Amino acid sequence: MKYFEFGQEHSELMVMLHGGGVSYLGMLPTAKKLAERYHVVLVAYDGFNPGEPETEFVSPMDEARRLGDYVVEHYGGKIDILYGISYGCRVLMEVLADKHLTVTTTIADGMGLRDYPNIKSKWGKDVYCFFFTGLFYAVMGHPGPRRKRFLAKI
């Protein structure tokens, strides 16, 4: 997980969470514009950052935990605005559940309402995700080496 920061001269902290299947680069122009008014932290999940192709996305819960640790360490656990789009809303919901964080305003843009079950095994998660998202997940849903090999072939 990597954090890109803009507008550090501003006091209000906005954390932006991108959707699934895309990288943080899709939100970069918006983050730069918002940095004219806010201190923006744009999050790049493991497995979705082109600059870190060796990383693997584990779960929205893992990304939220790591983001929470980062915010507590660097900003005392306070987020003024938490913005998530699409699958980023899954991470957003997990961040909201973190008792160590204080979030003033939340924007959940395009939030899916499907529950993410607490499945312990990786195989079980793969089967669950395959049936709910189809073949696309099987091919592209494991960011990192598998996606890199697949994209190199097409």
Where are these regions (language model features)?
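Conserved HGGG/HGGXW glycine-rich cap/lid loop of the alpha/beta-hydrolase fold
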Residues: F4-E52
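Active-site catalytic pocket residues across diverse enzymes, especially alpha/beta-hydrolases
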Residues: L34, K99-H100
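Active-site loop/oxyanion-hole signature of alpha/beta-hydrolase fold enzymes
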Residues: L42-Y83
